[in-house]
Amino acid sequence: MNIKSEFFRVDFIIGARRLSNYFWATVVFLGSLGFFIVGVSSYLQKNIVFFLSASDILFTPQGIVMCFYGIAGLFLSFYLWFTIFLDIGSGYNEFDKKKGIISIFRWGYPGQNRRIKLSFPIKDVQAIKLEVKEVLPARRMIYIKIKGQQDIPLNRIAENITLREMEDKAADLARFLKVSIEGL
């Protein structure tokens, strides 16, 4: 959902709360939990869960390795769920012609830089830049060029948009800001 008017525009950015992240966090959690349970079952020499058999697995070295992989996977899945819970990377791009300010906001990790907000005068915008790298996976980025600053990305790196959609977004934003488009 984006908000647009003649003098004001807000583009919302989806962060870590994507369906693919939920899927992979769940898969990693269940897989690592299975590894850990089988490793502990091999140590206890009895099946903790009826559908995960550990009778053919010796605790040394297979059970130890399975416990290690299970613990490592659980840490990874907790990290993924933590980023989903905090919605890391989400935010908005706000363009206000009346105030003459562009504000770019993103949520980060807890701590000093949890809220990342950049503000620039609209008059400092030089162009909208497009970058396309057709490697696996294809990388299509929209940047805003600002005087004296490095190019600032306006979309997610993992955002899977077609070339046409990217061109349309960039052209719409360039018309709104009355600047040119570079790239391609």
From Swiss-Prot:
One of its GO terms (biological process) is photosynthesis. Signal peptide: none annotated. It holds the Pfam family Ycf4. Keywords: Chloroplast, Membrane, Photosynthesis, Plastid, Thylakoid, Transmembrane, Transmembrane helix. It is a multi-pass membrane protein. The keyword Lipoprotein does not apply. InterPro entries: PSI_Ycf4_assembly (IPR003359). The chain crosses the membrane at residues 21-43, 63-85. GO terms for cellular component: chloroplast thylakoid membrane; photosystem I. It is found in: Plastid, Chloroplast thylakoid membrane. The keyword Plastid applies. Belongs to the Ycf4 family. NCBIfam families: PRK02542.1 (NF002712). Seems to be required for the assembly of the photosystem I complex. This is Photosystem I assembly protein Ycf4. It comes from Chaetosphaeridium globosum (Charophycean green alga). The lineage of its organism: Eukaryota, Viridiplantae, Streptophyta, Coleochaetophyceae, Coleochaetales. The gene is ycf4.
